[in-house]
């Protein structure tokens, strides 16, 4: 396994994105024959391109977590046409990451219908241009990118662990993260009362910052889930595809979408290039456990992941996440403890 890229903590910049666009990751060649791969948000962009690669590399079963079954069917048909994989390979399961009930239903289906899951790629994410609450009462990016992603990860851990034990080699749980987590100012997340509450407040919402904030919080979640899992059974990591020409800004107004699209056109990777990182992240060894996978390397995360203050805030936030999820499901902490 490669060592860290640099001792400099992760941070985004135009020059870094330019470099990344000129140095795309290697295209994975690992065979996924005999493997069952789960991916959320595979309808478009990075998720679609990653799913396409998994199919082309011979995955025996692909589980698609999709909000829209109609769009899921379109993606399935497209991938089958391009890879000639059998219709029995791709399975569509409905998943609305804004709904706890939908997440629970999805996890139950996965656990009951599939004997094994060798890798789960938690790719679904949003970048809302305006403040909006989820049905569960949280700001939408906070809900989907952080709270719901944490919940789904915890619900999938037992299946991943059982698969790893039976196979005699670790499975993979991948959080799709972002180098933007390194740009977050500590003042935006520091709150003695509640970090969740602070990030959830409409008065604190700035669409230009919220996505990066949620990606920092997701990094914290990833590290704590990794701490709860044995790397010999489940390798948990975060993967950053860098700035990509993807559908992430699809909800932006035309005034916002135009400059966003222009920047991505000039210094962004293609969705196909970015998806290579999502695929290679589930081929990493135990040294990548709890790590930040970027540019085909284990990179150094941002300061608020590695510093003493960041770790202290991370502990506070993790307790808040567990408190929130335990209200929905009293078995959350038990599921984590059984994986450690």
Curated annotation (Swiss-Prot):
The lineage of its organism: Eukaryota, Fungi, Dikarya, Ascomycota, Pezizomycotina. Short-chain dehydrogenase/reductase; part of the gene cluster that mediates the biosynthesis of the cytotoxic leucine-containing cytochalasans, including aspochalasin C, aspochalasin E, TMC-169, flavichalasine F, aspergillin PZ, aspochalasin M and flavichalasine G. The first step in the pathway is catalyzed by the hybrid PKS-NRPS ffsA that utilizes 8 units of malonyl-CoA to iteratively assemble the octaketide chain before addition of L-leucine by the C-terminal NRPS modules. Because ffsA lacks a designated enoylreductase (ER) domain, the required activity is provided the enoyl reductase fssC. NADP(+) binds at residues 46, 71, 96, 123, 211, 215. GO terms for molecular function: oxidoreductase activity. Keywords: NADP, Oxidoreductase. This is Short-chain dehydrogenase/reductase ffsI. Pathway: Mycotoxin biosynthesis. Belongs to the short-chain dehydrogenases/reductases (SDR) family. Gene3D superfamilies: NAD(P)-binding Rossmann-like Domain. It comes from Aspergillus flavipes.
């Amino acid at each position: 396994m490669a060592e860290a890229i640099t001792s400099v903590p992760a941070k985004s910049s135009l020059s870094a994105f330019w470099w990344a666009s000129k140095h795309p990751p290697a295209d994975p060649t690992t065979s996924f024959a005999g493997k069952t791969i789960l991916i959320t948000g595979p309808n478009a962009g990075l998720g679609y391109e990653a799913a396409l690669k998994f199919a082309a590399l011979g995955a025996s079963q692909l589980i698609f977590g999709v909000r829209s079954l109609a769009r899921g069917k379109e993606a399935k048909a497209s991938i089958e046409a391009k890879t000639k994989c059998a219709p029995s390979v791709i399975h569509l399961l409905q998943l609305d990451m804004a709904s706890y009930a939908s997440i629970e239903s999805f996890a139950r289906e996965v656990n009951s219908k599939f004997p094994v899951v060798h890798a789960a790629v938690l790719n679904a994410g949003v970048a809302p241009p305006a403040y909006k609450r989820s049905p569960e009462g949280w700001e939408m990016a906070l809900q989907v990118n952080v709270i719901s992603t944490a919940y789904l990860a915890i619900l999938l851990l037992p299946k991943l662990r059982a698969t790893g034990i039976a196979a005699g080699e670790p499975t993979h749980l991948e959080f799709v993260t972002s180098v933007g987590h390194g740009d977050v100012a500590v003042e935006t997340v520091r709150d003695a009362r509640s970090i969740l509450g602070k990030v959830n407040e409409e008065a604190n919402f700035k669409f230009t910052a919220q996505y990066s904030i949620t990606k920092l919080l997701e990094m914290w979640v990833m590290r704590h889930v990794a701490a709860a899992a044995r790397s010999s059974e489940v390798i948990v990591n975060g993967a950053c595809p860098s700035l990509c020409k993807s559908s992430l800004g699809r909800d932006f107004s035309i005034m916002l979408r135009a400059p966003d699209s222009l920047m991505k056109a000039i210094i962004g990777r293609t969705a196909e290039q970015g998806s290579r990182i999502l695929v290679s992240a589930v081929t990493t060894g135990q040294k990548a456990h709890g790590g930040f996978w970027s540019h085909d390397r284990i990179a150094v995360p941002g300061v608020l992941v590695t510093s003493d203050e960041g770790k202290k805030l991370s502990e506070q936030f993790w307790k808040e996440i567990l408190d929130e999820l335990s209200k929905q499901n009293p078995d959350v902490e038990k599921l984590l403890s059984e994986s450690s």
